[in-house]
Amino acid sequence: MRHVAVIIPARYGASRFPGKPLADLAGKPLIAHVVERAQRARGVDVVAVATDDDRIARAARDAGGQAILTGPAATGTDRVAEAARKLAPRPEIVVNLQGDEPLIEPEAIEAVIGAMEAGVRMATLARPLAAGELERTQVVKVVTRASGDALYFSRAPIPHRRAGGESPLARAHVGIYAFTAAFLETFTALAPGRLEGEEALEQLRALEHGYDIRVADTGYRGFGIDTPDDLERARALLAAGA
């Protein structure tokens, strides 16, 4: 088995919700929930938080994870790549898990790791679309080849269904990524793409430069904390047993 690291990028100064990783959720910092759930995933050798903030680093260690202090980074993926270089031993597979997903299901992490067993360089997840989601720009859609590799990701409703109604071929993207350590370095060295800029979707950089992304299925719907209202909803879901 290859050495697998889950690296969670987290910064204090989020514009919409400053201090989000340290926000209290059921008696512990939000970032602690992400660390603890990632540790429950099978096949994970190390869970680390990549951050430029000592307070977040302390919370990560208190939750049982590693903390890696990084410099200023343009994107979370850049922060993950820097952290991966600092880990010893160096991981062979790196999972980029967002630090605002306190309800992440360990099975979703296992699914994206499992997709890498086919020898691919990069993988992500998708789930069935719920009713009405096809038209929502906040929900990123993905269509794939027969091989399971992504053809395109878009905020637009893809594919268009000539017969009308929502296409059964459309799926919702779930933003968890796995990379080989070597391809993570390649990816972060690539110039941002034009379509990436138009859609504001970083994963399009790989497709624009001719690299494949394997897309695996998951039942996890994804739930990121972007606002204090989202945090209240997460509190309710945890209280209900999520």
Curated annotation (Swiss-Prot):
Record keyword Nucleotidyltransferase present: yes
GO molecular function (one): 3-deoxy-manno-octulosonate cytidylyltransferase activity
Protein name (database record): 3-deoxy-manno-octulosonate cytidylyltransferase
Lineage: Bacteria, Pseudomonadati, Myxococcota, Myxococcia, Myxococcales
Pathway assigned to this chain's UniProt record: Nucleotide-sugar biosynthesis; CMP-3-deoxy-D-manno-octulosonate biosynthesis; CMP-3-deoxy-D-manno-octulosonate from 3-deoxy-D-manno-octulosonate and CTP: step 1/1; Bacterial outer membrane biogenesis; lipopolysaccharide biosynthesis
Family matches, as Pfam families: CTP_transf_3
Keywords assigned by UniProt, alphabetized: Cytoplasm, Lipopolysaccharide biosynthesis, Nucleotidyltransferase, Transferase
Family as reported in the entry's similarity comment: Belongs to the KdsB family.
Role description: Activates KDO (a required 8-carbon sugar) for incorporation into bacterial lipopolysaccharide in Gram-negative bacteria.
